[in-house]
């Protein structure tokens, strides 16, 4: 358990650092008009999650805590969201997958807006 926790912590630090560098680099290249860095991180993270799911299924998942939960979790949680949605779809639960995607996005946006409204009201 401690070994897995350390793997997740180290991977998370590396993933978060990679996310930060990607965002800083994209801001310098493309400017702040569109969140290119976040889009890059989400697409690349989802691609890498797809690669790791297949590779680790064949090679063993000894490094899954470091690579999947740690590095990709620190890099982007969108990769885990994408994996969950595709897993539901591949299990033949397309309706549940669609509901998961819709609810996740909708409720996350609502949660963000509620948090912002709560703090703005408190700080006013």
UniProtKB/Swiss-Prot annotation:
Na(+) is not transported, but it plays an essential structural role and its presence is essential for fluoride channel function. InterPro entries: FluC. GO terms for molecular function: fluoride channel activity; metal ion binding. The chain crosses the membrane at residues 36-56, 63-83, 99-119. The keyword Membrane applies. It catalyses: fluoride(in) = fluoride(out). It is found in: Cell inner membrane. It is a multi-pass membrane protein. GO terms for biological process: cellular detoxification of fluoride. Na(+) binds at residues 73, 76. Keywords: Cell inner membrane, Cell membrane, Ion channel, Ion transport, Membrane, Metal-binding, Sodium, Transmembrane, Transmembrane helix, Transport. It comes from the Bacteria. GO terms for cellular component: plasma membrane. PANTHER family: FLUORIDE EXPORT PROTEIN 1-RELATED. Belongs to the fluoride channel Fluc/FEX (TC 1.A.43) family. Fluoride-specific ion channel. Important for reducing fluoride concentration in the cell, thus reducing its toxicity. This is Fluoride-specific ion channel FluC. The lineage of its organism: Bacteria, Pseudomonadati, Pseudomonadota, Alphaproteobacteria, Rhodobacterales.
């Amino acid at each position: 358990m401690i070994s897995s926790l350390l793997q997740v912590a180290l991977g998370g630090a590396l993933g978060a650092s990679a996310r930060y560098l990607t965002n800083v680099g994209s801001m310098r290249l493309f400017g702040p008009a569109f969140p290119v860095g976040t889009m890059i991180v989400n697409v690349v993270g989802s691609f890498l999650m797809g690669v790791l799911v297949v590779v680790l299924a064949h090679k063993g998942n000894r490094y899954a805590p470091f690579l999947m939960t740690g590095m990709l979790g620190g890099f982007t949680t969108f990769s885990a969201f994408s994996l969950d949605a595709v897993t539901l779809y591949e299990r033949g639960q397309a309706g549940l997958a669609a509901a998961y995607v819709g609810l996740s996005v909708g409720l996350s946006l609502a949660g963000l807006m509620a948090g912002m409204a709560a703090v703005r009201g408190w700080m006013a």
